[in-house]
Amino acid sequence: MPRIISISMIIAVMLQSMTACGQSARAPSTEDTCADDAPAVALTAEEAALYDSTVGVLLTQELWTDRDIYDTAHALMVPMHYAFAAGDMEKIDAFAAFFDRFAADVTGADQYSFQEQGALNRLQFYYFTTQFMVLCAESGCPEKVPEGLLPMIEPQVETVFSEWPSNWKSEPTRREHFYQVLAGKQYPYSYYSIIDDVDMYILAILCDLGVYRQKTGTELTAVETEAAEIAYKLLASPLLNEETENGGWVFQRGVWWDHPNFAYADYQAILPDMEPKPRRDVTWDSSHFTRMAACIISWRNAQPTQKRYALIEKRRAQLATQFASEICKKVNGYWLATTFIDGTNGVFRKYSGYENSAHILIGWWSLLGDVRIRQIYTEILKEFPLGANRDTNPYFDFATIRDQNPFYDADTGYDLGMYQCMVMCASKLPCASRS
């Protein structure tokens, strides 16, 4: 809920300090239930071994390298949320040790050239980091956050917000881009007006830092306050948001229609000698929009008033409905994703309809905290083991061919158990979204 100082908040903080990060007031449930107030489901001995042999091993590695930085934030986000939801001190401490090493290196020698990474890679990893910071603060253990993280991340992301040009240089700064899009500016290409994944992360990181400052009793910066307001305005704007008849939600419909990646969106499958055939009403591809499932919670939790909080909470619930009823479909016994978030299929990049479903397995959709989504992940978990080939595994990502960590690479990650672990954690998160 919005953070209004009250006696109840003071009591909550006292109780939180008594439960000290690992000893949750409510222990993880051993039953696979999904009531709205159900806690995280505890791992069996076999499941705990899977977690340790995947996430536990990864957290001993320096994952902010050029090879691993992008994938790590995707793959470890939900296992990290599970650790805190379950109140598992051993797992939380493993993440704390990982971020200790990260902070020491990046604020020191920067041995792996993290600071030279591109904007999306760094921001995605920074978002993973600020989520850790917020989870620590919410769980009553802010002392586990390395001291160097806030002074490193905050000025960098504020600079990106205030000084870096928008994508395609449509505006001189990201800040200006937000306001021009809200004002309905007409661009030479429709996709110039997109609020892209970098924009989502910028606002989410700044919102996280604002929540962290509130939780730790320090004053928000002006940019953090502004970022929360922009996030609200983006989700409130009638120009950008469409509520569907079944209670779902679509963001910026049609904005991508003239982008090259969407040039063949009106084909259901890749055909030889295709000519461009775009769709004017095309929506975000579901793979990239999975990031909104996490970012929308960060945006919501930073809101200072009940009105603004309630609007973004409404969008969260609508996005959960959109995923559960339109995006995620049962196809030949598997839960697969439609190409686009309006529930339609088409050709996107190298994928035909339902072929770009690997994003479901990283589990970010589960962060929406919805009963229906948790049930979907419970059913997907029963599909394992899944093979490391396209013929027997409909989630297999055949299009990503860059060098990857063996735990993240589709050729090896299924056999090593990483994909199963991500789905397992997603199936056991609490149904009520974090507030």
Where are these regions (language model features)?
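N-terminal carbohydrate-binding/catalytic regions of secreted carbohydrate-active enzymes
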Residues: 52-127
